[in-house]
Amino acid sequence: MAQKKASLACVECGSRNYSIGVSSTPKPTRLEVNKFCKYCKTYTLHKETR
């Protein structure tokens, strides 16, 4: 199956900084990763949005 595009949004400011490819099969939980936010200028939690 093909991958769908999803983006990772910063929890602090809400900006969508990263885009990723995720499998099209549904998952019960969404991906959460600590990444650098260029607007907050710090490492923050980013959650998967569709």
Curated annotation (Swiss-Prot):
InterPro entries (UniProt xref): Ribosomal_bL33, Ribosomal_bL33_sf, Ribosomal_zn-bd
GO terms, molecular function: structural constituent of ribosome
GO cellular component, one term: cytoplasm
Lineage: Bacteria, Bacillati, Bacillota, Bacilli, Lactobacillales
Keywords (A to Z) from UniProt: Ribonucleoprotein, Ribosomal protein
Name the UniProt record assigns to this protein: Large ribosomal subunit protein bL33B
Keyword Nucleus: no
GO biological process: translation
Gene: rpmG2
Gene3D superfamilies for this protein: Ribosomal protein L33
Family in the record: Belongs to the bacterial ribosomal protein bL33 family.
Presence of keyword Iron: no
